[in-house]
Amino acid sequence: MAEIWFLVVPILILCLLLVRVIVSKKKKNSRGKLPPGSMGWPYLGETLQLYSQNPNVFFTSKQKRYGEIFKTRILGYPCVMLASPEAARFVLVTHAHMFKPTYPRSKEKLIGPSALFFHQGDYHSHIRKLVQSSFYPETIRKLIPDIEHIALSSLQSWANMPIVSTYQEMKKFAFDVGILAIFGHLESSYKEILKHNYNIVDKGYNSFPMSLPGTSYHKALMARKQLKTIVSEIICERREKRALQTDFLGHLLNFKNEKGRVLTQEQIADNIIGVLFAAQDTTASCLTWILKYLHDDQKLLEAVKAEQKAIYEENSREKKPLTWRQTRNMPLTHKVIVESLRMASIISFTFREAVVDVEYKGYLIPKGWKVMPLFRNIHHNPKYFSNPEVFDPSRFEVNPKPNTFMPFGSGVHACPGNELAKLQILIFLHHLVSNFRWEVKGGEKGIQYSPFPIPQNGLPATFRRHSL
């Protein structure tokens, strides 16, 4: 009997191993194949190719070679790039539960781990609703007089400068509007110290993440601690006053979940800093591009001036403030904004990470791989926008095809503050074309990334008063 078992056991083990190999092979085959593309050098992948040229050229050349879904390796991470509206919707909307937002740890430290865009699930849903309720039309329409004041103050200061770095000054404007929307009327001392420390964090955000004393990143980490301290002081003051506020901070302080739990000071601080980051650079970049596009097309600029002049005269040459109705009745100016968003594609792509193995159109997206919907490739695809390299606001007289225009992202992680962004841009442009002329200086053309695309050197220009 022992001799029989001596022969049977090895045969059984061999059979089990064969079954396991066959099942594993079938499972592997059923998982689909990886998308076409090149993974480049070990670890580095194609990082050098991406950063040594215009990233839009890199992605466009890849799409021409491999199609609308392709693989690569960037900064050590295997990635799948998606350049079709259907694929973007798949990742961001219909199958969003299979993908999670992903950011480098170094950037998460500077913004704060509790910030809205690092999360999914109930916490993300709660915070997103708070952001949306803070920036509903019913809320932001009350900010119009204050945004007007900020816009006019900014423009008047520019008229006294020999040369204006348009992008840098637009960042200051967007920051001041962000502070207004978050805190309401904040004491100037708090505003200045917030601005000082925020600027240090902003400079270190895209620096090499080396936390050694003296480096930009280390300075940014120290300034981030200061920001948390300042925001905590403001929170304590607000709680002592027990005043019901409808600004973003007020919504955060008044929040309770279904279990009666409130947000911690750290969660509040992280989300305030996160909203500031989201509000500043993208709005500033968009405004800078609009000024360039209008400057380069004087006929279009005159048409925008004519539209704004009607409102200017209706308000007795600015003796009356803008109204919400008037900001909703600027059709040409609005089309200029959305065409600028398409043309510049300030949010060129977004990052997600597959949380499970995902199959899309016969291709495998393995668990743990980064996934990047390429918004700019979609916005500049002639299948969806004719003559995509031509700036033409009239194209938006007809609504674009579904999922082909995503300037603020899409799905549950789309920008919840886009209405505030559009409102402040409309207000700024009204006062700009009604009261000023500007002239772009320097002959440099092209795009630089900081990290968002902006005109070369931030569009240096002069601004002079000139009423309609």
Swiss-Prot record:
Q: Which Gene Ontology BP terms does the record give?
A: abscisic acid catabolic process
Q: In which tissues is it expressed?
A: Mainly expressed in flowers. Lower expression in siliques, rosette leaves, roots and stems. Not expressed in dry seeds. Expressed in silique envelopes, but not in embryo or endosperm during the seed development.
Query: Keywords on this record?
Result: Heme, Iron, Membrane, Metal-binding, Monooxygenase, Oxidoreductase, Stress response, Transmembrane, Transmembrane helix
Coarsely, its chief localization is membrane
Q: Does the keyword Heme apply?
A: yes
Cofactor(s) it depends on: heme
In short, the EC number is: 1.14.14.137
State a GO cellular component annotated for this protein. membrane
Question: Would the keyword Cell membrane be found if you checked this record's keyword annotation?
Answer: no
Q: Which SUPFAM superfamilies match?
A: Cytochrome P450
What is this entry's stated membrane topology?
Single-pass membrane protein
Q: What induces it?
A: By abscisic acid, dehydration and rehydration.
- Known role: Involved in the oxidative degradation of abscisic acid, but not in the isomerization of the produced 8'-hydroxyabscisic acid (8'-OH-ABA) to (-)-phaseic acid (PA).
Q: What is this protein called?
A: Abscisic acid 8'-hydroxylase 4
Biological source species: Arabidopsis thaliana (Mouse-ear cress)
**Organism phylogeny:** Eukaryota, Viridiplantae, Streptophyta, Embryophyta, Tracheophyta
